[in-house]
A protein has these predicted regions:
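Long, positively charged amphipathic alpha-helical accessory segments at protein N-termini or as interdomain linkers
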Residues: 7, 69-100, 111-258
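N-terminal lobe of the biotin/lipoate ligase/transferase fold
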Residues: 1-96, 160, 251-258
Length: 258
């Protein structure tokens, strides 16, 4: 096998601060599968598209290295697995309450209409397998700039104690490991219902400039959105155009043959 469980080797700076957990793992050579890196603060984090992502004190942040022989068509689903793992871990550590945490496709975590976290995955193919770095940031005790797990828990479950950062991190990694194993063996299909039960998009209408309106129905086998023409039966996959900061402002339609 590949050795240790996710997080069996955990790197954490003594000062608490790092430029980026992702960069540290990316630049280090020969780290074993499952190596994770966490920091209390990072100043050079990255979001999707290489955008700078500052992470203040109070965020739960980590990156973890996965080495996997899964096919390239399955690798993109690991970002969905990470989002799902985060919401499930919060639920299991917060008295069974998911705190209204929801997944905004493809890789953001929202609560009360505000972004509270996000996932970044990068991959490289080496020696017959993929090396995938999964990075996740979640507002844990920092009430700014939006809201955080601590505030959501206090509002919804007064008197319920906040889990430790370490316990929540362990819970996320445990579930991510389980989900990655499922994707490797069977693809994302066994996880799809759990994922779409926790996302924001079922029934969401997407309007196009030509007046066409599509209704999101779920996730296609490709990992893109599956939508149906409003009032019709034609099915489409919705793809981001790759040039927009917000996926939802630039979706491209591709008709799915009947």
């Amino acid at each position: 096998g590949r050795g240790g469980a996710l997080g069996a080797l955990l790197l954490s700076p003594r000062s608490g601060a790092l430029p980026s957990t992702h960069s540290l793992l990316q630049e280090a050579q020969g780290l074993p599968h499952g190596t994770a890196c966490t920091a209390a603060r990072q100043g050079g984090g990255r979001g999707r598209g290489g955008n700078a992502w500052e992470s203040p004190e109070g965020c739960l942040m980590f990156s973890v290295l996965l080495r996997t022989p899964m096919g390239g068509e399955r690798v993109p689903f690991l970002q969905y697995a990470a989002s799902l793992a985060a919401v499930q871990a919060v639920q299991s550590h917060c008295a069974g309450d998911d705190l209204g945490l929801r997944i905004k496709w493809p890789n953001d975590l929202f609560a009360e209409g505000q972004k509270v976290g996000g996932v970044l995955c990068t991959s490289a193919y080496r020696e017959g397998q993929f090396e995938v770095l999964v990075g996740l940031g979640l507002n844990f005790t920092n009430s700014r700039p939006t809201t955080c797990v601590a505030d959501l828990l206090a509002a919804r479950r007064p008197g319920c104690s906040l889990p430790s950062r370490e316990a929540l991190l362990a819970g996320i990694l445990e579930r991510l490991e389980e989900h990655a194993g499922t994707i490797e063996a069977c693809g994302f299909t066994p996880l799809r219902d759990a994922y779409t039960a926790l996302w924001l998009h079922t029934g969401q209408e997407v309007r196009f400039e030509d007046g066409d309106t599509l209704v999101v129905e779920g996730l296609a086998d490709s990992g893109f959105l599956l939508a149906r023409r409003k009032g019709g039966s034609e099915t489409f996959e919705l793809h981001p155009d790759g040039n927009r900061l917000d996926f939802w402002t630039g979706l491209l339609r591709r008709r799915v043959p009947d």
